[in-house]
Amino acid sequence: MRILVTNDDGLTSMGIVTLANELAKEHEVHVVAPETQLSSIGAARTYNRPIRIWRWNGGLYNGPVDVYATDGTPSDAVFMGINMFKPEIVVSGVNLGENVGLESLFISGTIGAVIQSSLIGVPGIAASIEVPPHSKFIIPQINGDYFSGIVKVIKGIINHIEAEGWVKGVDALSLNMPSPSRWSGGYVVVSRMAKRLFKETVIESSDPRGNKIYWRWGEELMPLDTDTDAYAFYREGKLTVTPLILGDSSTGLSDIVRSIEELISKVIRA
């Protein structure tokens, strides 16, 4: 398959490097991704200035992978990449840090990228993995083996899609995998996302010149509703698979969940 790969952590993140290199062993892979870290930018687009894109030769990626950097957002990267390469599917990730709960749909650049592709008509997979809390908004030095579990799942889904077609009634899939030490192979197809996971507050401080500065930060809310993606992820250590449906679907939700469960079951057992 012809695959477009992007992310919001920047094209030097080991998550996207590992994913692209692995996919390129079996598929035609093009990477178009932000040059720098752009976490929590959602599906933002650039309209107030030109978007620059250039071939990137900074190493890290294996020879077959075609790599471009952009000064735009993940959504811009997908828009440009679809116009340039006409991919059959877009894969966004692997994001450093999970994207669990309803807020992630509006905040995550990883998910924003596949929302953009879906609006154009190209299905997408957004993939995220749990990392230590202090690493969520930086690029930690994580070995490529850390991503082996979720990369295996992504490759399995793509191989299934290549053989049997995309999941009927679904625009995109969002995958969230616990850290390797917490994941034992369990999974859940999500029909309800947790509404709010953190109680945010304003943290006030000062810069070296004495000017006031502010941070948004918060602690995890407790307890978690047991029928949500957050509970399955944080409390049960399960891979969560969330179907994203933009608008009405002629396929019933129960049928969608059943078909995804069958797909993921085959992938996990493989």
From Swiss-Prot:
Record localization: Cytoplasm
Cytoplasm listed as a keyword: yes
GO molecular function, one term: 5'-nucleotidase activity
Pfam families: SurE (PF01975)
Cofactor names: a divalent metal cation
The EC number(s) this enzyme carries: 3.1.3.5
Keyword Manganese found: no
Domain of life: Archaea
UniProt keyword annotations, A-Z: Cytoplasm, Hydrolase, Metal-binding, Nucleotide-binding
Cellular component per GO, a single term: cytoplasm
Main location as per UniProt: cytoplasm
Catalytic activity: a ribonucleoside 5'-phosphate + H2O = a ribonucleoside + phosphate
PANTHER family on file: 5'-NUCLEOTIDASE SURE (PTHR30457), PHOSPHATASE, PUTATIVE (AFU_ORTHOLOGUE AFUA_4G01070)-RELATED (PTHR30457:SF0)
Function: Nucleotidase that shows phosphatase activity on nucleoside 5'-monophosphates.
Record's protein name: 5'-nucleotidase SurE
Top-level taxonomy: Archaea, Thermoproteota, Thermoprotei, Thermoproteales, Thermoproteaceae
Gene: surE
